[in-house]
Amino acid sequence: MHWKHALIARVDARVHAAPVPLPAEARLAAIAPKDLEYLRVHVSGTYEGKATVLVRAATGLGTGYWTMTPLQLGDGRQVWINRGFLPAGTRVQAAAATTPSGPVEVTGLLRPTEAGGSLLQSNQPGADRWYSRDVRAMAQARGVGAVVPVFVDAQMEKGAPVPGAAAPVPGLTQIQFPDNHLTYALTWFALAAMSIMALLFVWRRRRWNG
């Protein structure tokens, strides 16, 4: 149980730390995804709005899409940015139209790629139907080169606003750690308490009948 609590504490520290630059390609390749996940980063560059992909999402705001757009960085790399949530019924052209033109700055949380699709459905690039944020598959489908193997869940975006466009809602990253060890411990305590109560009930009943 202690290791799980230590993990939660480490991730909590990353989420609330000051943002750092996106790690170099060599570091991204050398470090395990779990050691980079939820790292708070700051990136700047120019969006490739025409390459926007909509990925199915279910959030506290309802069902809809994550708005994934590649950001061209100054060092030549491209990183997919989850700009935020748009409601069901949004078309990819409308989502792309919300993309700021010119330089932008994004602060957010680093996330590992979600290869293949969701638990229930596989991505269908040919039909432009996406159920997970698979950075390499999206890059291949949109002709995006030099893409890094992670994406950024945007918390804040600074750029020229697009007049009349309803921008995606950022900052909806869900960080959950199901504490199974604690659940098991509570379950065993509950079972033990129920057993004791049952024994007491039987003992008292025998006394009354005795």
Model feature map: region roles:
Residues 1-210:
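Surface-exposed, charge/polar-rich loops and edge strands
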